[in-house]
Each structure stands twice: as C-alpha cells, then as structure tokens.
Amino acid sequence: MRGRSAPSPARLLLDQLRDERGRRVVLVSHCLLNENTRYAGGATRPGAVAEAVGELIAAGYGIHQLPCPERLAWGGVLKPHSLHLYHSKGRLLYPLRGLLLRAFVVWTRMVYRRLARQVVRDVADYQRSGITVAGMVGIGASPSCGVTTTLDIRASLEVVAACPTAALTRDVMNERAVLGCRRKGEGLFIAALDRQLRRRGLQVPAFEHDLAAELRGSQQTLLTPGALRTLDGLGTPGD
C-alpha cells in the first residue's frame, strides 16, 4: 500500500504560520449569492439570499461561489437559448419542440461536463491544501442545481409554450412552470458533478436550498437538517 504523499512546501508554510482561516469551505450555488442570474420571475432578493449566506458566515465557513451553469450554457445572464419555445404553441417551432428539447439537453450536458470538471479540480485543490470541503448547497426544483428535487423540463416547457405572452406572470412562472413541474431527482449539473467526483474518488456532502420556501416567503436553514446525500457518483437518485 502506498503511503500518503508528503505535504507540499506551501502546505507546510501554512501549517507553520497558523493564520486565522477556518480551513472549512462550502460550495454554494451561484444564485444564492447573486439572484441577478435567476430565471426571469424567480428572483426574490435584490442580490444575495442574506439568511443563507449569513448562516454560513456565522458557522465559520468560507463560501466558494459555484459558476451559474445555465448562464454559461444558455446564452448569458438572461438565458436566451432557453426561451425559443416560449409562447410557441400554434406556431412553426411548436411541432419541433421534442427534437429541439433533445438537442438542447445534449448541448447542456456537454457544457456542464466541462464545468463539473473544473469544480472537481477546485475540490481536489482545497483538499490537497488541508481545507475541508464541508458541503455543497444546491437549489431545489432547479433543472441544473437540484440535489434531490429537479424540474421536469418537458412539462415546464409545455406550460410556457401554451401561455400567451400577455398572460405570463410571475405567479404562472413560479407556481405552474417551476414548482408545479417539480420531480424527484438531481439536476443536470449536479449529475455531472456526481460523475466527476466519482472518477476522482472524492465525496462532498450535499444540501439543498428550498426554492419553494424562498418563493413563498418562508425562512429556512441550510445546514441544520444535515446533508441530504453525498455527491460521489454513488446512490444517485433516479431520473
């Protein structure tokens, strides 16, 4: 059996100088720190979800903001690539929605695989540096960042495709197109993270921010209930 590799000079220096860092970090979904990247209609705060961030700060964790995978895969902050089939029922693109959705998901998975590889490199870097990655916080009902609940993208698409432009309100978007189309399972980005962590032999406890509670104005805690599952490619919820 091979022994553990010797600590690097940088790690030895950190141990020698003993500064005030807590050596614990939590990976946090991008929109918990910046709701400007939320889907249209889904932002409930001008910026960060203060109680979520405050809980982590009070517990002494460093906060590592994950990339917003949807911004990077779907055309930018407003995610224009995801909007082509909105209000499309009765129009030219609507009969092609199944084919277009399959192509959209294939593209999304390709981008998410690349992003997940970088996140896993970050996790490995923290661990080599003697810093514990104590958890990852996803977003419930997200098609990308859901840990145990995600979005039925096809069902959500049917809601927004059938809704006339003038009738699409925040309530329709949040209650029908998002919360009304939730299902058990993990989002596409979390699934990519699962696979990449398994390949590197790494594990990260996973927590989930309750988007429904946030949208409906309820307070919640991220860490008190304990991790919902461990991201490592094993025991992945079924699609």
Task: Show which residues each predicted segment covers.
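Short amphipathic alpha-helices and their capping/turn segments at secondary-structure boundaries
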Residues: 2, 9-21, 48-59, 117-134
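Divalent-metal-activated hydrolytic enzyme cores
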Residues: 3-5, 21, 90-118, 124-128, ...
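Internal, conserved structured core segments that host functional sites
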Residues: 98, 102, 106-109, 116, ...
